[in-house]
Amino acid sequence: MPLRRLSIQWKITLLAGLCLLAIVALLVATSLTQAHRSAALVNQANTAMLEDSARQRLQAHAETQALRIQRYFMDAYQYGNGFARLVQVLKDRGGSDLRAELTRQARASLAGNPDVIGLYLVFQPNALDQQDSHYLGQDAMGSNESGRFSLYWSQPSPGTLELEAMPETMLGDTSIGSNGAAKNRWLTCPQDTARTCMLEPYLDEVNGRQVLMTSIALPLLEHGKVVGVVGLDIGLANLQQLSVNGRRDLFDGQGQVSIATAAGLLAGNSRDDSVLGKPMDKSVADGLLRVAHPFTPIPDTAPWQVVLELPESVLQAPAVALNQRLDAHNQNANLTSLLIGLGTAIAGLLLVWLTARGVTRPILAVAARLEDIASGEGDLTRRLDYAHQDELGQLTGWFNRFLDKLQPVIAQVKGSLQEARNTADQSAAIASQTSDGMQQQHREIEQVATAANEMSATALDVAHNASQAAQAARAADQASQEGLQLVDSTRQGIDRLAAGMNTAMDEARALEDRSGQIGSVLEVIRTIAEQTNLLALNAAIEAARAGEAGRGFAVVADEVRGLAQRTQVSVEEIRQVIEGLQQGTQDVVGAMHAGQRQAQDSAARMEQALPALQRIGEAVAVISDMNLQIASAAEEQSAVAEEVNRNVAGIRDVTESLAGQADESARISQALNRLANQQQALMEQFRV
């Protein structure tokens, strides 16, 4: 191996350097991993924090826009509410010029508020002064064709006012307008709900152009009942301008501001004013963030919404820029860590190399001393000198003690080599004599091995014959057991047969009794037939005496007598059959008695045969056990003979081996003699 060929200095340097590099690499990798994780956590936290800050900024901007819009509507609401109170005061005061006063006050109020497009005041029929019939068609008094007060002042442009009395057709127009509600919703909503209503934005023509507007309608209540409606039309162009201005303030105009009504219609859109009055698209495009802030334009109305939309890329731009700066800083820090780790590893390798050199320098000095001893003709009187008490000092000390022990041993070996040479000569002579004795012993063991083989063959024959006899005895034992089972089964069958014959005898006796009963019945029938015959004969005689009058009766009497005679004949035949049946039954009963006695005798003989068969089985089992013992003994004798044969063969092999070893011992003795001479020459090289 290349590693084995390296010096200790390089091995220490290499292994320690690898460990140092592994530790430095592990520390640097751990530092880089932790830095990467920290950077990821910081990036995630920064992104979340900046996104949250941006969302809060969007929410705050939406609240600001909502407050501006709410203030715009609240100004109009306060204006309408104030005018409604004025109308209520004027109505309560009354007077013949009430309609003219209301018309003048409405004009003055509208002229003072140029942002309002129109102001209207509508009373229920005869709800103002109970004089609608006196003002038919008087538009200047705000009365329509039915005399109903339905005043409408419009302001197409600031300072330009136009008076109109709304006709009944307009007040009752329920057709659907552009905002999806009835055109007279401005009137019916406060009447039906008795609450302030704000209509969905709708388009109306003002000075020849379509203007998006809405209406705020307030009910006039009297004793809890709606008697009229005050309303004002507000243009929503200011809302569009608010949305455009809000977009400029939203991330340098990169977002979008929309104002949506309660029904989802657009009242303002900073991107496209052509969609005003149309439903807002509720779907959000990918990569776009939408924030909606609800607000109530005026009290007691459905909430509107200020909807802000901003691309997520714009929202995340500060976080992305910060993350990029952090990534650049982390890369520089990682590069610095790598350079520091590399410099540390190089410095550590240099220190390890110097340390290894300091450790191996004394070892090289000791090796040089050992080389000097080895090359100095085996002088065992020289010793190593090393003054330090470190591991190398222990090595030199123990080596000197080893030489202290080795020097007298070598001296003794040199003195005993001559004695070893003489002993080797004597060993050669003894080995030759041992070889001759081994040859004689080998011939005698050959004869013993032949006799052991013959005895082993005889023992095998005996074991084989005994095994066959044991098998035959086992077969006989099995046959006797089967015979015993058959005899027992036969005995049980005979017992069942005897029981069946007893039952049959009882039934035969019962049959014989029933046959006797049948004979008695037949005897009664025969007697009845004889009496019937006599009665029929007497009847025939009486009929003959009667002449023609008894001829029919004579015919019947003849028929009855014939039937009685046939009955007697049939009864006689049945009696003969019954007597034959009774005789057969008696014969069967006698045969059954004989069979029963024979079955009982057979069962008794079977009972006697069972013990004999059991004794035969026991004797056969004893014979089988003895044969098995004989076979086992013969097998053991054969095994012993085989063992003796193997032992004799082993002794023969050992004898042959000993003979060969004796010859080999003689040769070894001669070789020992030569080796002793060589060792003597070698020992002469050491100086003790």
Curated annotation (Swiss-Prot):
GO biological process: chemotaxis; signal transduction
Record annotation: effect of changing residue 186 to A: Does not bind putrescine. 100-fold decrease in affinity for spermidine. 36-fold decrease in affinity for cadaverine
Domain notes: The ligand binding domain (LBD) is monomeric in solution. Ligand binding does not cause major conformational changes or alterations in the oligomeric state of the LBD.
Database matches in CDD domains: HAMP (cd06225), MCP_signal (cd11386), PDC1_MCP_like (cd12913)
Family annotation (InterPro entries): HAMP_dom, MCPsignal_dom
Location (main, coarse): membrane
Chain residues that bind putrescine: 202-204, 233
Any one of the GO CC terms: plasma membrane
PROSITE patterns, sorted: CHEMOTAXIS_TRANSDUC_2 (PS50111), HAMP (PS50885)
Pfam family, one: MCPsignal
Domain (HAMP) ranges: 357-411
Gene knockout outcome: Mutant shows increased biofilm formation as compared to the wild type. Mutation decreases plant root colonization.
Bilayer topology annotation: Multi-pass membrane protein
Protein name per its UniProtKB record: Methyl-accepting chemotaxis protein McpU
Biological role: Chemotactic-signal transducers respond to changes in the concentration of attractants and repellents in the environment, transduce a signal from the outside to the inside of the cell, and facilitate sensory adaptation through the variation of the level of methylation. McpU is a chemoreceptor that binds and mediates chemotaxis to polyamines such as putrescine, spermidine, cadaverine and agmatine. Also binds histamine and ethylenediamine with much lower affinities.
Ranges for domain Cache: 50-284
SMART domains for the chain: HAMP, MA
Cited Gene3D superfamilies: HAMP domain in histidine kinase, Methyl-accepting chemotaxis protein, PAS domain
Organism expressing this protein natively: Pseudomonas putida (strain ATCC 47054 / DSM 6125 / CFBP 8728 / NCIMB 11950 / KT2440)
Bilayer-spanning residue ranges: 12-32, 335-355
Outcome reported for the amino acid change (mutating residue 164 to A): 20-fold decrease in affinity for putrescine. 7-fold decrease in affinity for spermidine. Increases affinity for cadaverine
